[in-house]
């Protein structure tokens, strides 16, 4: 089979979505041409150039590293259109106007390479209608590729073919989008707004309709429909503000214009409050006001009755809040039976969505799985709507929905289809089973895609009722304690690498985790090719996602502190350091599979591994200053070793300060990387470390790296000796700048003390510049500083504040 290579991509349209799609492709190291109209004044590429500059200012940041903006090449349709022939994929992302898109297609079509894929990022226009006027050959290479905003962070991409799109085109794109760009791909039918926006926007319209019926405020609704339901924290109206009220109004209009025969058509009317806000130019976050408005430090919410902004903060009824913590079946039953408006409102919005997806599944998606994944990945729900229905008791909920339809309480007078109430789905208790997910058109449960790219996903996004592998029990367990599980993937050819997964809260590291890790390494040295440290929590999507490790387990260390004071902690610190050295000098490669946060001791564990395989959305740093301490698990020691290595390579061992400054600043300022690429720029990742874009491929990639290292005769590094250090003169230089910061009141006296101890550790202590030390010397400096600081009242205040409130104390 020949390789499908994407060497360069063109993005047509440098607006909000086009520019951000281009930025994320650059994150994935795909060269991109960003096209827009030629400017009427100044440089012809001014529009695209301005868009690239604006990307640097956006929050959340579209680039993993801001400087990567230089890899985006600006272009215009007048001077650069011939460059389209260099591109293997062309993605159109201009405004949602069918006529504008057709005009652009006429202009660019003759210049698209004969084997290139042509795609549109439309959020809901008909792909078939967009392809009208194309040659049959170009139609066969055309499809919809719908990214969600913001493209870097939203996992979903919908792939929408027409009747003419060649199947291999879709397979090639799905493979590229999944593995290289890191997305979750759902194939949708060419119906208005596809799957995610069709169901997601309906759910928002249902919320607005039912909220008005029950007389609820917007902030009240958001407290009810956000994290309490396992959905995005921004809930309903805050989400609308973030998306943009004009964008939302456009998506609703697409439904109005194209779904006149839909029994739910009355719901598709633009809500009066939304229409009025758009008319006033209050488009949400981008204009400074929408359903919410920031006034000074206060967040105000729109009062629908008066049209004025009032103080926000309305909360869910306490009884209803308690109901929402009950198991799914009990929760839905209690909501339905409770008279409080909040409970009735919640039952109503659940019923409305269940009714809608039951009626429309066959027309909008191939199967129920695609609906659930689209809503989870595109709208940030922890559970898709079909999953929620199935978890609450399929048949009982279906009967309740039918009763409300018959009573005229539903939003449409249309019955649930027969497949919901009888036959295989009713018998199996839902749409997701061990065989697959229900596809109404073919009347069967269809399995997951067997596209080769999914062979790299040991664990695919699980669904309620599906027979997916459970990462907490999967494979063959070698040993398990309260702190760790060591296991192997027992499939043929996969059982040669020991996988260690932590079981502690936030995967923090205490003595019991260290013991388990050392035991796993000893086991691997006898019978296996390597060790991978991988956490099942990595499968949690979102930002920052599930943690790799939040660092040392302070709570586990507290009894030793209470009994022996600061000195009583020293054995804990020494054990942590020895554990890290055991990782570093293991006789088999230890590979850290990192995603989410890797902070403090979690970062140090990663630094001591033979190799790091890191998900692009990883947030890495030594943050101990936040609790008044210094890194003492070898993180500062590793900084000194790397600085010495760099200085030796540059023949500058008498001027090591410039090589250690970045590491000092990283630790003293508790800097955390904004991405894996940023972590590499900060020095936490080496150029040889691997960055993975799809978190579901992380474990597979890490195992392959461990095997590859073993295959070439891996040997642990020799123990560090004769390490040149920056010494007392460098410490004095750093302290001089710290004094200025302290005297200018940028840092406190205690901040000064902590930063001084970090400087002493990374510079090798009170010795002459260029003096030679060993690893144990550097570790002793860390331990001494850690124990000293732990004995101070201000550090103890910081630790207690963090343990009690989860927030740093400034003192």
Where are these regions (language model features)?
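N-terminal glycine-rich phosphate-binding loop for ADP-containing cofactors
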Residues: 1-529, 534-540, 553-575, 581-588, ...
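Amphipathic coiled-coil signal-relay and dimerization helices
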Residues: 549-551
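Short glycine/serine-rich donor-binding loops of glycosyltransferases
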Residues: 603
